[in-house]
Swiss-Prot record:
It is found in: Nucleus. A zinc finger (PHD-type) spans 122-179. GO terms for biological process: protein sumoylation. Zn(2+) binds at residues 390, 392, 413, 416. This is E3 SUMO-protein ligase SIZ2. GO terms for molecular function: SUMO ligase activity; zinc ion binding. It comes from Oryza sativa subsp. japonica. It is an enzyme of class 2 (transferase). InterPro entries: SAP_dom (IPR003034), SAP_dom_sf (IPR036361), SIZ1/2_SP-RING (IPR031141), Zinc_finger_PHD-type_CS (IPR019786), Znf_FYVE_PHD (IPR011011), Znf_MIZ (IPR004181), Znf_PHD (IPR001965), Znf_RING/FYVE/PHD (IPR013083). Pathway: Protein modification; protein sumoylation. Gene3D superfamilies: SAP domain (1.10.720.30), Zinc/RING finger domain, C3HC4 (zinc finger) (3.30.40.10). The lineage of its organism: Eukaryota, Viridiplantae, Streptophyta, Embryophyta, Tracheophyta.
Amino acid sequence: MALDPADDPLLADCKYKLNHFRIKELKDVLHQLGLPKQGRKQELVDKIIAVLSDQQEQDSRLNGLPNKKMVGKETVAKIVDDTFAKMNGSTNAVPASRNQTDSGHIVKPKRKSDDSAQLDVKVRCPCGYSMANDSMIKCEGPQCNTQQHVGCVIISEKPADSVPPELPPHFYCDMCRITRADPFWVTVNHPVLPVSITPCKVASDGSYAVQYFEKTFPLSRANWEMLQKDEYDLQVWCILFNDSVPFRMQWPLHSDIQINGIPIRVVNRQPTQQLGVNGRDDGPVLTAYVREGSNKIVLSRSDSRTFCLGVRIAKRRSVEQVLSLVPKEQDGENFDNALARVRRCVGGGTEADNADSDSDIEVVADSVSVNLRCPMTGSRIKIAGRFKPCVHMGCFDLEAFVELNQRSRKWQCPICLKNYSLDNIIIDPYFNRITALVQSCGDDVSEIDVKPDGSWRVKGGAELKGLAQWHLPDGTLCMPTDTRSKPNIRIVKQEIKEEPLSEETGGRLKLGIRRNNNGQWEINKRLDSNNGQNGYIEDENCVVSASNTDDENSKNGIYNPEPGQFDQLTSNIYDLDSSPMDAHFPPAPTEQDVIVLSDSDDDNVMVLSPGDVNFSSAHDNGNAFPPNPPEASGICGEQPRGAGPDVTSFLDGFDDLELPFWESSSSQDAAGTQVTDNQCEMQNFIVNHQFLHEPILGVNLGGTAASNTLECEHDGALQACQSSDQDGDQNQTCHDGHSGDLTNLSIISTQDSLTNGKNASQKRTNCEDGTAGLDGSVVRSANGLRGEMPPLGQEQDRTVRQKLILTIESDSD
């Protein structure tokens, strides 16, 4: 026989609560019971009551609950009771009629399992009133659903103003604040719930009157036995509501505490001194002063501010336990976010910044030096920790930081000095990878260089095992890349066509050097070549020309193949990589071969025609130039022992190079060519001497009409190799022993070149290093002056210095 609902107090209590439920709460109960949630409100109530009345079989049509899914009445009653408590905001917030039904039956409230305060309430305010009103604020704690009255917990700095206080961007309740203030204590129980301490009143003399706060709390046997363990303590704490540092303890001015009549020291600072931003107060431990049963605490203070006081049973944590609360490296922050922060800090702005922005920050250095030492201990960082809200990239040693805060309780960033809590600490994924790699180095290695792109290297010597090289942000070795294009100078084989000289046009030679699409210099090839010319000697990248010298000149001592002389000659050979200095000459006809030196891609070239240049020893204005002495301009190959200084010894490598010499004009081609019996007397060089080891930076070959309009006031590219006496009566040339083998090239220089050349035109006849430099010439040769010829077969082997050389000398057959 079913029990009448009037005789079942549990059913009557649940029915009373169900009548106050909304549809939302009814559906929540049905959802937990696994029952259908469709229907009107009364239908939902009937489904729940049917489960409580033990009539599931008769009412299966109504509730649709199978027998195998039946639940007990105690379970249903607990679900209904919990839902009712959440709806009203507190488990104790039940109206007075809750304990008495409409029929007059008394319902005994359910006793709590212990004396601890219930923390899983929705409304809990220090004022003691647990009903919600129109102005509520919710705690941001992840496991806290507490709501509090705004007027009780948000205190205005100027209470006299009628303007309501501004809500903070982040709000934490008093319990969450005290938990984060010192993570080395974990709250177990609250014998005294947080209670508000009102400000003191102002006395007649303007001072604040001393006020007292008394609170009696029970201590159960279970809690008393818990406090007998070493890791548990009873602590009294106090916080300021509108504290600028939310996660810390702070006591009022002139605070004194008595526990069961025993006075206890509260703070170590002066009673009249307020706590600064960097200061921290501690909570006195009451374990030695309490007893099982009732205990009384009395607080006296004299302060105009509003505080909150409470008593808790807390358990101590070790350093390892606190470190375990810090998220792992992969859980704290994404590596890309850490890299973006480093790039922003090192680069001086975001990636969106450009040259048109108004930012005053400019990157001056290629890299920034970063110290890997902890700012608190001075030792090298082992685990790079940081506070997540910080915008800087500075880090600290995580283990050392946590260990130091066990006493100081100052969870403050040592770089920017902003206050946070343990919940904000993460492991920096960027710097933690670097510190892990640096652990194998000595203690003196503590700095790295960081580029704006995030790549890094350790500053130190070669003992760093590769860490001194640049690494990518993820720690991998960075491959060396050089974006700057280096000139790739190569010797390009060229075939030059020799055309027969005539009185009308003369013979022209074209050597085209231009820059290709890849930015490299190259020599244009010609298909119609004649390889039966004088030869070059090529040793890898070294190419020089051999001057025409016969046996007779060798006997007379004109040719000097001494080893010291050859070493000096090979060191003074220069290449042909030059650019034009004077581009005001008209382009020459393109039907014949000319010499071209240009860094332009245009096809218009400047030419120098033998017929257009005055080959006479005397110029139009009477100036004369000495010819180039017939001696070896450079030796870059090894000459066999016992070989005489014959010209054929310099022509062995000609077929490989395929670069013919300049063909000299005959005496019939240029009427101005004169021959004398003077033996290569070198005097009055009209040159501007440069150091023989300097490269030639500007070369231009230009030609004019046959009338030779190049005067002294024009800027010529080549210096002449002929000279005359000061009065212009006697001309001098260099005779090489062959009646018809002459090479004379007269090129007019500028007036400045003439002046400078005459100042430096003292006779240079030093036999040890007889050299002559031609400033701005196409062919810069190192010529040894005439000296004594050593006997044949006594020539020593010479070491060849490899250089990028392209030297062209003219000689005759």
